[in-house]
């Protein structure tokens, strides 16, 4: 889980303002931060199956947002992938 401060920083960076939380880029950025935190946790706790399941759910959720972004605006998709360092 990421802190409120980290989440607010991501919202400001990718959404433009604090209230623009529904933007696909914001959702993808938040999910990416949560995924990286869970990945670090799983490196230390290899047998934590519930966290692994949650990680897979978040990866699938991020994939849905990315697919949506590809359909709506390919340029925004390419920008977010480049900024976050996500594979295609």
UniProtKB/Swiss-Prot annotation:
Keyword annotations from UniProtKB, A to Z: Ribonucleoprotein, Ribosomal protein, RNA-binding, rRNA-binding
Disulphide bonds in the chain: none
Q: Which Pfam families match?
A: Ribosomal_S15
List cellular component terms (GO): cytosolic small ribosomal subunit
Q: Which GO terms describe its molecular function?
A: rRNA binding; structural constituent of ribosome
Biological process terms from the Gene Ontology for this record are: translation
State the source organism's domain of life.
Bacteria
Subunit composition? Answer: Part of the 30S ribosomal subunit. Forms a bridge to the 50S subunit in the 70S ribosome, contacting the 23S rRNA.
Describe its function: One of the primary rRNA binding proteins, it binds directly to 16S rRNA where it helps nucleate assembly of the platform of the 30S subunit by binding and bridging several RNA helices of the 16S rRNA.
Family membership: Belongs to the universal ribosomal protein uS15 family.
Q: What protein am I looking at?
A: Small ribosomal subunit protein uS15
Instruction: Cite the source lineage.
Output: Bacteria, Bacillati, Mycoplasmatota, Mollicutes, Mycoplasmataceae
């Amino acid at each position: 889980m990421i802190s409120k401060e980290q989440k607010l920083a991501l919202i400001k960076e990718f959404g433009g303002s604090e209230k623009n939380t529904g933007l696909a880029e914001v959702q993808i950025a938040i999910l990416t931060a949560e995924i990286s935190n869970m990945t670090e946790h799983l490196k230390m706790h290899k047998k934590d199956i519930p966290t692994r399941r949650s990680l897979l759910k978040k990866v699938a959720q991020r994939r849905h947002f990315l697919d949506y972004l590809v359909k709506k605006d390919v340029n925004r998709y390419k920008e977010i992938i480049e900024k976050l360092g996500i594979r295609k």
